[in-house]
């Protein structure tokens, strides 16, 4: 079994896991392993380098347009990128508001 990288530690019971931003996937699963710079990818996708940089650093969301471009460039599907973003957004919202919403909103059965 491969050992964790120097940046990653084994997951232990009780650990709180942060949501994974699509930019982290882009950097760690695509750019890094393929030896691609953010600038090179941006040029090939015909987007500003700043867009790729902000996505990689979790400061920008993957839009439908960017998902189409990432999919074309890396040979994936746009749904892959959009689903990563949607999952991230839901996890962030759940962490921020999930408990409050659960206490405020009645279920259909409770409201009847």
Regions found by a protein language model. Give the residues of each.
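N-terminal flexible/basic segments that precede or flank functional cores
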Residues: 1-28, 33-34, 101-105, 110-112
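The DNA-recognition helices of helix-turn-helix-type DNA-binding domains
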Residues: 48, 59, 74, 85-88
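Alpha-helical residues within the helix-turn-helix
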Residues: 32, 43, 72
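Short, basic-rich loop-to-helix N-cap that marks the start of a DNA-contacting helix
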Residues: 59-72
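Short alpha-helical DNA-recognition segment
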Residues: 36-54
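Short, charged recognition helix plus adjacent turn
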Residues: 82-112
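Residue-level signal for the short linker/turn that defines the boundary of a DNA-recognition helix
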Residues: 35-36, 65
């Amino acid at each position: 079994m491969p050992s964790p990288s120097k940046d990653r530690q084994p997951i232990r019971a009780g650990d709180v896991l942060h949501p994974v931003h699509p930019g982290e996937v882009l950097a760690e699963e695509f750019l890094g392993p393929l030896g691609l710079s953010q600038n090179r990818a941006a040029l090939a996708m015909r987007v500003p380098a700043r867009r790729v940089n902000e996505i990689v650093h979790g400061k920008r969301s993957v839009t439908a347009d960017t998902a189409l471009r990432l999919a074309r460039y890396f040979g994936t599907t746009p749904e892959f990128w959009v689903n990563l973003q949607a999952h991230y957004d839901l996890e962030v919202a759940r962490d921020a508001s999930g408990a409050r919403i659960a206490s405020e909103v009645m279920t259909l059965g409770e409201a009847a």
